[in-house]
Design a protein with these regions (language model features):
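A generic "folded-domain core" signal
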Residues: 1-145, 151-176
Length: 176
């Protein structure tokens, strides 16, 4: 019984924190003049490998548009990866992950990405890779209460991406 009370209290505190954070996110969502296009705030993270030798900068934001005639929403997540490597990663696919960390449901094969490079040495360059993933309205709205976790698969590595409950709540408070 004590564990259930502690878990209930923790869930309530997390929900209250998510509400506060979602209000901040909602204020940062950009809306077009005609109210048909939306851009969420950019979130940036630094991912490090076990030995922290080659940190990766991961940035993302949601972008949505509403059709004029039937009010259907189209959503995509824009992703920007910056890293130092011998070759570009070449992201190929994104899998949806469940709450237990299993990432077995293919969301989308990733098409073309934009890759730029700079500061090359004999062995490595600084790469910036930009790509997008289409996400269904149902998938995003179903994820508001638990967040959305994805696995991004490249030729070299697999990375995780987490869209928080607060981000999705704030974004969809505006995108209606």
């Amino acid at each position: 019984v004590t564990l259930q009370l502690v878990n209930a209290r923790d869930a309530k505190l997390k929900y209250q924190n998510d509400l506060i954070e979602s209000e901040k996110i909602a204020r940062m969502v950009l809306v077009s003049d005609n109210g048909m296009s939306f851009i969420g705030p950019k979130i940036s993270n630094t991912l490090a490998d076990i030995m922290n030798t080659s940190p990766v900068s991961q940035s993302y934001f949601l972008e949505s548009s509403k059709s004029l005639n039937n009010e259907v929403f189209r959503h995509k997540i824009q992703l920007i990866y910056s890293y130092n490597a011998s070759k570009p990663r070449g992201f190929k696919a994104a899998n949806l992950c469940d709450e237990w960390g299993r990432c077995e449901t293919l969301i989308q094969l990733i098409g073309e990405s934009s890759v730029s490079f700079s500061n090359c040495s004999n062995t490595n360059c600084n790469y910036t890779e930009v790509f997008e993933i289409d996400l269904s309205d149902k998938l995003l709205r179903d994820s508001i209460q638990k967040g959305l976790r994805m696995e991004l698969i490249s030729n070299k590595k697999t990375d995780k991406l987490n869209l928080s409950v607060a981000y999705l709540m704030g974004y969809f408070n505006v995108v209606q």
